[in-house]
Amino acid sequence: MKNVYTGESDEHIIGNIPIKSINIAYLILVHRLPDQFKKLFKAIYEPSNFYLIHIDKKASEQIGEEVTDFLKNYPNAHILKSENVIWGGYSMVQAELDGMKYLLEMDTRWDYFINLSGQDYPLKSQKIIREFLSQNNGKNYIKVVDQEKKRPETMNRIENYFEETGDRISDKTHKRDFMKNVTPYIGGQWMILTRSCCEFITNNIEVKKFEEYYLNTLIADESFFQTVLMNTSFNGILINDDKRAIIWIPDGDIKLRPKTFTETDLKFLQTGNHLFARKFDDNVDDKIIDNIKTQYDQPFKTFAKIIDIKSLNKTFNHLN
């Protein structure tokens, strides 16, 4: 039976507890601002963790060389073969899947997979993050809601045929029937997943039909993983929370984009129970990260309540 954590109950404090040794495998997606990436990398670096960096094929040769040269000093950091990642295309999902597979095939043992962009930054130290994952070992963190019931305006993304052509999504599309006996789910791109969850996603034969269908959908990175985990025999615990602090603002007629944080957002970043925030740009505000660091090792409260998967649709009303 799948369970989903959605409510607030069973308070406990992270920051002063004995921890099981938790090793983290990070996948970091980089396409610009190499100095911002370096700042992120140094903030999350631990010798016992593992780091896989994907540099977008569209990134300049200079960025690729700068990032590659920087990582030479870190033996537990690797570079993934570049994918031409197109906004809205399945190529983003493919980069994530390739990253999971690469990390699973490494001759090392890790417990959790966390994906980040090069403009993310941690709100807590690795000590606090590892304590949190130790206390909640076995739980998977990913935003998930019933797409048709809670985000009906996005159904066109999966009920039409889309195709990547060159560096964009083709304007030509046509309607098609969605997958039979499958309930579509949606959430966000960012995840904190157990190793066993990654093994299921990359190795289980049930996932193949989802890969084939979602190859020609729009913004698949926000719904592919959710739909797979909610419509297969995967039996892990899913928590409707990606532990990311993001403020979404309008960007044109059809999409939102994450606000670039400034010092005016500091209270928002310091009062939540998030582990990471997106996004930052020192060219916009080069002081905000220094202020965040002052609370790196302060414990934070986290709340959880197990809800049976059958009650899922009744429990998300307060999130929309």
Question: What do the PLM-derived regions correspond to, one by one?
Answer:
Residues M1-N320:
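ER/Golgi luminal nucleotide-sugar-dependent glycosyltransferases, focusing on the catalytic module
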